[in-house]
């Protein structure tokens, strides 16, 4: 075979293009080409000690897609590869069936990839195929694709003995393929500074089954750590055993047609670069991830599907919560009925004596897991990497999600201790303009359950503690909260991404109305991170949870699963649906738009906000937090209660303050971002600067509630009762906690520093200066200089009033001064030059005012010492030699 022909064949094998030709045709052409060019093998060999028959003698034979031979007593497994299975593309799906509940949870869907078995000399390679770069198989450029991009070898095994004497089948030791760290536990645990290495000697096969189209393999993998650290879920942290499920399957034959994605609606994508034509604007081809749902009777407007999506409720789900899980799943049928599919989703209960494994990719399972202290849920799904067709989904719900009202912990307070927040880490992250850790995640991550658990904790304690909103049944509260969570996670398994703009479509007054929210819900989408809907108005409150689909959810399903009208092309249908983008009820923005740091530009695209007026919403949350704090001594200091609960409830209010800072600050230098396309009905331009008045309102909100002299004033009686838990736990919390008393100054400094770091963020200040050039000169502008002046006046108001400065304010002023000095003389090119000038001007202003104040004899000793220290720092900064870059 000449070299060029070889490249063509490998290119065809690799690419499996589905852009212009069907997946089935590509696979068949690959098999024919390979078969035609294979050398004819002579399998009749003289007997040897390594004969196929001798190797598998007395072993259990497991026929199926891949024939397996298993000797359980010797823990020996052979995998047979037929000659026509070499170089053929299959799917491999990996699931973690059980974990350690510390770093790795059970039921986690892991890798899903196309692979081939390739014979290289006397070895068989297990190769992950690269499907990200493609071209039509007969295009000349397909040769360049093969030359330019690599596949990945996952593992390899020696061929055992002779080929089968009749069909030439080969045997390999399955341990070399499946008893290895494919889940990358070693790499991931290394991130936590707890690196575990696979111990192959003590890893083994648990169960093997094989069928016509799939082979299912369960293994137990032992990982060890020679320098273990405490891991409270393990009896010995030097050793942990995980179980993994491998599913090997044929690429399913299907008449599924990929659907092109559109940025106006949010779906998970299967994408690749197609180099068949160099005349396209972009090589990217992006498909919506969706299930193959077709009408059984397409001539009718309403029809049952040919093959519905079936979800199984695992038998681990507590009986008392199964109805809520079922309700959350079936809510999506409302959206499918609107596009003409009746009963698109079916829910079944996994029996206690089920013989199938929930890790089997043929079953979509809602699973209950235990990971102490982690109230979370995730809803991953798996898509055909060639077409975007979804074929498997699992949802994992942590048991602690519904244990929120029993939690007793000190972790939250520990994280805001002055020992932690007064370090240089937060300051360095500010001036280096580092992304928060959570913003390095991709769009597949979901933390809704964790946040919802905290929201439910706050809401329940507020309702039960203040009694402002009347009585409520705890069981119904938990039921509705679980429905809210499940419908969100099922949405992910249907292909929908987060929509963090959906909560901005209803007015504050509408959200207070029970009648309105019962009809319309509390948000535009279940795919937002929706807080519990609480009102500071004691006379009216809407429903608490989103237990119905929102307007956006119907739209997203219509785009992904709807059917073109008779005579209408797919392209025209999709454009008609997507062009509804300007509808105020269909607002969309997703993970990369909703950053809570200064890189998030749109204040209406945030997590944990609500209403058309987020600032008003957060003003309500501040009121609620203070009412909760005021109720602590009255409602929680009673016989039978414990002081640690008071400490925990107090921390819930702090959490509300922290959220309000991150999202309210987004208005300052903010830009409303829209996804409309040119020509859309009522189309809007992509960017609109937030009005100057709204930016001022945001700064005033933060000044009043976080930075002002009156922002924090707590009763000593309350502070002296905020005790931590003193009984031991598996984590050793009683030993690790750095402050037994409540670190009130550290808490306040955390909130105030967070505010300043956000407002003075380099990216925000660059954007504010740019925004001044994007607004008509006749319009009111909120400028960077105005923000500097406003913050300086708020933080240092005592020097104008000639007042003593309290402890909270002294800490605030130290942080502010440190930031100004750094901007003025150590900017390191991160800050705009105008910001550097303004910082220096602020230092000169403060130098003059503080000089006068130090002469006053009426000031207390703290204030005098504080002012003298500040003046010394300012003098040194203004007289400092500037760095070379100046």
Where are these regions (language model features)?
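Bacterial Sec-dependent N-terminal signal peptides
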Residues: 1-25
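Auxiliary tRNA-acceptor-end handling modules of aminoacyl-tRNA synthetases
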Residues: 25-317, 335, 339, 350-473, ...
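The catalytic-center signature of Zn2+-dependent metalloproteases
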Residues: 41, 349-369, 480-536
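Zn2+-dependent metallopeptidase catalytic core
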Residues: 86, 320-344
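Short secondary-structure boundary/capping segments
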Residues: 94-96, 328-329, 362, 409-412, ...
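Solvent-exposed, polar/charged alpha-helical surfaces in well-ordered, non-transmembrane soluble domains
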Residues: 323-330, 334, 476, 480, ...
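Sec-exported extracytoplasmic/periplasmic mature domains
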Residues: 330-341, 371, 491-492, 496, ...
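Conserved catalytic/binding loops enriched for acidic/polar residues
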Residues: 465, 472-477, 502-886
């Amino acid at each position: 075979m000449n070299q060029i022909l070889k490249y063509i064949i490998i290119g065809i094998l690799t690419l499996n293009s589905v852009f212009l030709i069907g997946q089935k045709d590509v696979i068949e052409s690959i098999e024919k080409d390979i078969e035609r060019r294979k050398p004819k093998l002579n399998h009749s060999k003289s007997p040897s000690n390594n004969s196929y028959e001798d190797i598998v003698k007395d072993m259990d034979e497991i026929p199926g897609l891949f024939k397996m031979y298993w000797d359980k007593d010797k823990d020996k497994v052979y995998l047979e590869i037929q000659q026509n299975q070499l170089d053929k593309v299959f799917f491999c799906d990996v699931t973690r069936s059980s974990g350690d509940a510390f770093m790795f949870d059970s039921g986690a869907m892991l890798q899903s990839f196309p692979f081939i078995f390739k014979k290289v000399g006397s070895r068989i390679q297990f190769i992950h195929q690269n499907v990200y770069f493609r071209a039509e198989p007969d295009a000349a450029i397909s040769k360049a694709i093969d030359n330019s991009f690599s596949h990945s070898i996952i593992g390899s095994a020696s061929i055992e003995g002779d080929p089968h004497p009749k069909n030439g089948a080969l045997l390999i030791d399955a341990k070399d393929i499946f008893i290895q760290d494919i889940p990358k536990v070693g790499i991931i645990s290394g991130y936590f500074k707890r690196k575990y290495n696979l111990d192959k000697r003590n890893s083994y096969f648990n169960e093997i089954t094989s069928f016509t189209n799939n082979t299912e393999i369960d293994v137990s993998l032992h990982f060890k750590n020679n320098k273990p650290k405490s891991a409270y879920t393990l009896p010995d942290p030097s050793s942990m055993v995980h179980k993994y499920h491998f599913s090997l399957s044929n690429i399913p034959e299907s008449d599924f047609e990929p659907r092109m994605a559109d940025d106006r609606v949010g779906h998970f994508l299967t994408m690749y670069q197609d180099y068949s034509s160099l005349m396209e604007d972009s090589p990217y081809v992006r498909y919506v991830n969706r299930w193959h749902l077709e009408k059984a009777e397409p001539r009718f407007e309403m029809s049952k599907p040919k093959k519905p999506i079936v979800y199984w409720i695992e038998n681990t789900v507590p009986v008392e919560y199964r109805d809520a899980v079922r309700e959350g799943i079936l809510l999506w049928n409302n959206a499918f009925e609107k596009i003409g599919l009746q009963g698109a989703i079916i829910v079944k209960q996994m029996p206690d004596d089920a013989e199938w494994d929930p890790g089997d990719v043929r079953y979509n399972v809602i699973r209950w897991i235990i990971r102490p202290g982690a109230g979370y849920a995730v809803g991953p799904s798996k898509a055909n990497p060639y077409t975007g067709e979804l074929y498997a989904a699992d949802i994992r719900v942590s048991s602690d999600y519904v244990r929120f009202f029993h939690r007793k912990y000190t972790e939250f307070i520990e994280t805001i201790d002055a020992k932690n927040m007064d370090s240089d880490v937060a300051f360095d992250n500010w001036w280096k303009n580092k992304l928060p850790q959570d913003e390095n995640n991709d769009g597949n991550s979901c933390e809704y359950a964790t946040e919802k658990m905290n929201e439910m904790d706050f809401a329940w304690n507020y309702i039960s503690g203040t009694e402002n909103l009347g009585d409520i049944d705890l069981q119904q509260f938990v039921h509705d909260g679980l429905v809210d969570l499940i419908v969100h996670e099922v949405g992910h398994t249907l292909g929908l991404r987060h929509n963090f703009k959906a909560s901005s479509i209803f007015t504050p007054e509408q959200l207070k109305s029970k009648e309105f929210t019962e009809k319309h819900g509390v948000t535009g989408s279940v795919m937002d991170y929706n807080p519990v809907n609480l009102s500071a108005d004691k006379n009216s409150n809407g429903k608490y949870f989103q237990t119905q689909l929102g307007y956006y959810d119907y739209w997203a399903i219509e785009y992904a699963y709807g059917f073109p009208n008779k005579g209408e092309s797919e392209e025209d249908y999709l454009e008609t649906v997507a062009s509804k983008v300007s509808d105020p009820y269909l607002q969309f923005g997703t993970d990369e738009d909703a950053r809570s740091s200064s890189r998030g530009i749109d204040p209406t695209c945030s997590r944990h906000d609500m209403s058309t007026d987020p600032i008003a919403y957060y003003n309500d949350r501040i009121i609620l937090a203070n009412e909760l704090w005021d109720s602590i001594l009255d409602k929680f200091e009673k016989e039978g209660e414990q002081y640690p609960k008071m400490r925990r409830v107090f921390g819930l209010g702090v959490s509300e303050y922290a959220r309000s800072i991150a999202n309210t600050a987004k208005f300052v230098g903010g830009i409303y971002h829209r996804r409309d396309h040119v020509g859309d009905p009522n189309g809007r331009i992509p960017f609109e600067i937030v009005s100057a008045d709204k930016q001022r309102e945001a700064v005033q909100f933060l000044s009043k509630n976080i930075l002002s002299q009156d922002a924090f004033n707590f009763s000593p009686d309350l502070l002296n009762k905020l005790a931590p838990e003193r009984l031991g736990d598996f984590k050793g919390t009683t030993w690790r906690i750095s402050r037994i008393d409540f670190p009130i100054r550290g808490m306040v400094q955390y909130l105030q520093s967070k505010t300043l770091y956000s407002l003075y963020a380099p990216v925000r200040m660059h954007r504010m200066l740019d925004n001044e050039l994007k607004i008509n000169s006749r319009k009111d502008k909120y400028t960077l200089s105005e923000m500097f002046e406003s913050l300086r006046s708020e933080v240092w108001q005592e020097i104008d009033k000639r007042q003593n400065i309290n402890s909270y304010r002294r800490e605030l002023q130290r942080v502010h001064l440190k930031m100004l000095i750094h901007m003025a003389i150590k900017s390191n090119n991160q800050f705009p030059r105008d910001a550097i000038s303004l910082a220096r001007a602020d230092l000169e202003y403060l130098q003059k005012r503080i000089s006068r104040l130090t002469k006053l004899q009426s000031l207390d000793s703290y204030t005098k010492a504080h002012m003298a220290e500040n003046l010394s720092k300012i003098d040194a900064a203004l007289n400092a030699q500037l760095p070379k870059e100046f």
